[in-house]
UniProtKB/Swiss-Prot annotation:
InterPro entries per UniProt: Ribosomal_bL12, Ribosomal_bL12_C, Ribosomal_bL12_C/ClpS-like, Ribosomal_bL12_oligo, Ribosomal_bL12_oligo_N_sf
Lineage, broadest ranks: Bacteria, Thermotogati, Deinococcota, Deinococci, Thermales
UniProt source species: Thermus thermophilus (strain ATCC 27634 / DSM 579 / HB8)
Superkingdom, taxonomy of origin: Bacteria
The protein, known as: Large ribosomal subunit protein bL12
Keyword Aminoacyl-tRNA synthetase attached: no
Amino acid sequence: MALDIERIKEELSQATVLELKQLIDALKEAWGVTAAAPVAVAAAPAAGAAAAPAEEKTEFDVILKEAGAKKLEVIKELRAITGLGLKEAKDLAEKGGPVKEGVSKQEAEEIKKKLEAVGAVVELK
């Protein structure tokens, strides 16, 4: 059975973002694949060269260590970042813990910057 590439392209062009997301999830499940970027295989190092550096981490967890002196400002920022309710954000500010998990390096850095700007102590793992 030959694929009609143009027809498939037209169908996909008319699909909503939600429909495309569902299609992607169904294909991942059917084919047993993940969205992880493939890791390039490095060439063998030259004689005497050091081993290849470790893989760079792509997903980060943003951990709140301490709210600092401006706890109210930290709570407001936590609510804006996470969408948590007032009580949940207050508990997180008081006890510390994960703010967001499995985010990109750029997003993790932005969250850390926002929280540190209001006096919080934040760690990226």
